[in-house]
Amino acid sequence: MISIILVMIGGGLGAIARSAITDYFNHKFTSKLPIATLIVNLVGSFLIGLTIGLSISISWFPAFFVTGFLGGLTTFSTLAKELTLMMTPKFNINLFLNYSLLQFIIGFIACYIGYHI
């Protein structure tokens, strides 16, 4: 039961952090790519790799930080929505593919680097 509470608290905090980061980047930068989602997913991927690589032995930490906070911070559903919204009558296949590749390949690389630090 404590794990569920830790995931809920961490997830809520991660979602709040994502919302704040998204608001900040949407107001500061204009881009064809959704930069805020890219940033939170890459940072989250790196931190997941780092946390797993460090093998932190605090029993509550993975539930709170990895599953909760980083799960709330990163967002696959927003990525799916953004990719779907790119499929308009003015669909740009290069933008779509570049954004997809940035998210998945660079996300994996960020996780890998975090794991091996």
Curated annotation (Swiss-Prot):
GO molecular function, one term: fluoride channel activity
Binding site for Na(+): G71, T74
Any GO BP annotation: cellular detoxification of fluoride
Signal peptide start and end residues: none
Subcellular location per the Swiss-Prot or TrEMBL entry: Cell membrane
Regulation: Na(+) is not transported, but it plays an essential structural role and its presence is essential for fluoride channel function.
InterPro entries reported for this sequence: FluC
Top-level division of the source organism's lineage: Bacteria
GO cellular component, one term: plasma membrane
Transmembrane segments: 1-21, 46-66, 95-115
Pfam hit, one: CRCB
Reaction catalysis annotation: fluoride(in) = fluoride(out)
Keywords per UniProt: Cell membrane, Ion channel, Ion transport, Membrane, Metal-binding, Sodium, Transmembrane, Transmembrane helix, Transport
Membrane topology category: Multi-pass membrane protein
Family statement: Belongs to the fluoride channel Fluc/FEX (TC 1.A.43) family.
PANTHER family, per the entry: FLUORIDE EXPORT PROTEIN 1-RELATED (PTHR28259), FLUORIDE-SPECIFIC ION CHANNEL FLUC 2 (PTHR28259:SF16)
Role according to the record: Fluoride-specific ion channel. Important for reducing fluoride concentration in the cell, thus reducing its toxicity.
Protein name according to UniProt: Fluoride-specific ion channel FluC 2
Organism: Staphylococcus aureus (strain MRSA252)
